[in-house]
Regions:
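Intrinsically disordered, low-complexity regulatory segments of kinases
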Residues: 1-112
Length: 112
């Protein structure tokens, strides 16, 4: 028997969240307002990331463009058939949730 998960209501619009602390309707608005603030330099990649952000139902589905200057502890791993592979830590960290008070994304970085 399948029992659907019930999430709390969004603090912003008061509708039921689509994921844990995730309101698709409100986050679509927040992502769209931020489109002008970043670019990969490639329109196709930008569109792919933007489409992903608009269709995500919870934070684990969200892709973001990370500029090189937002990475640290960059470490070369190996060379493959299509390029070199590196790993790094992200200064800002991934999106945790929308902070209604500060009107910005609350983020979680690699160190904490």
């Amino acid at each position: 028997m399948y029992i659907p998960l019930k999430y709390k209501n969004c603090r912003e619009c008061k509708q039921e969240n689509t994921g844990m602390l995730y309101c698709k309707a409100c986050n679509v608005k927040h992502f769209q307002q931020n489109f002008k603030n970043w670019t990969s330099g490639n329109n196709d990649i930008d569109k792919f990331i933007q489409d992903n952000q608009l269709s995500a139902n919870f934070y684990g589905q969200v892709l973001e463009w990370i500029p090189y200057n937002k990475l640290y502890d960059i470490e070369y791993i190996a060379k493959g058939g299509f390029g070199k592979v590196y790993r790094a830590k992200w200064i800002d960290g991934f999106i945790g949730y929308w902070d209604n008070i500060n009107e910005n994304w609350e983020r979680h970085n690699s160190d904490g």
